[in-house]
């Protein structure tokens, strides 16, 4: 896992026409305008852990399934201040982000340990430490406070972007990242379901090194 603590920037609450919320418009936060093609949808951390936590191979469901169930909410309608955590990762399948739930298992396991104070501290990943010439440490007490809050949300592309609007979601990533307080780089060792390593002729092994070689992942890191 890699961690990158970001500075919070003013966030937009521009409505998304296709998935527009029907609640009273007076409930919408007033904020700076934003030209992101797709509104930001997020999942409450507690809901994420309830749905996917403590499962060895959780089935990662689609945006449409979670939205219909009420698990996904549009960011601009969340009242008050919140903490946003952006999950950056390399897809494990060509058509599905995590076909057997391996990455989601590692993510929820790590979040639960941080939430319970079982990890003493986290430091900024090596890439960003070198890039920004400093390190940022988040202590166990900090993580317990953040992750036990009812106002901590997760953005994960696998189920926070409508399947019919992947391109709009990709183009909106800079806006999403600006809004987030933390980025977690999810890059556990695992095997890609479809991609073949040209050297070994076998399915490619994924890790932090392959994550950094993917163009979109590098884009997110900056």
Please identify what each model-predicted range represents.
Residues 2-222:
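The feature represents the membrane-entry module of six-transmembrane cation channels
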């Amino acid at each position: 896992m890699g961690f990158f603590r970001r500075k919070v920037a003013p966030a937009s609450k521009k409505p998304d026409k296709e998935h527009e919320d029907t609640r009273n418009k007076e409930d919408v936060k007033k904020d700076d305008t934003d030209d992101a093609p797709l509104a930001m949808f997020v999942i409450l951390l507690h809901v994420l852990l309830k749905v996917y936590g403590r499962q060895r191979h959780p089935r990662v469901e689609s945006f449409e399934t979670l939205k219909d169930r009420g698990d996904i909410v549009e960011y601009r309608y969340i009242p008050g201040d919140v903490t946003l955590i952006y999950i950056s990762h390399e897809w494990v399948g060509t058509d599905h982000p995590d076909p057997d739930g391996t990455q989601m298992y590692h993510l929820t396991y790590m979040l639960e340990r941080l939430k319970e104070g079982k990890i003493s501290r986290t430091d900024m990943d090596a890439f960003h430490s070198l890039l920004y010439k400093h390190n940022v440490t988040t202590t166990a007490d900090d993580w317990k406070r953040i992750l036990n809050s009812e106002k901590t949300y997760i953005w994960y592309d696998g189920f926070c972007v409508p399947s019919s609007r992947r391109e709009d979601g990709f183009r909106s990533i800079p806006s999403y990242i600006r809004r987030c307080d933390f980025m977690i780089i999810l890059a556990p060792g695992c095997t890609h379901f479809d991609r073949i390593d040209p050297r070994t002729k076998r399915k490619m092994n994924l890790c932090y090194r392959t994550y950094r070689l993917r163009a979109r992942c590098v884009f997110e890191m900056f």
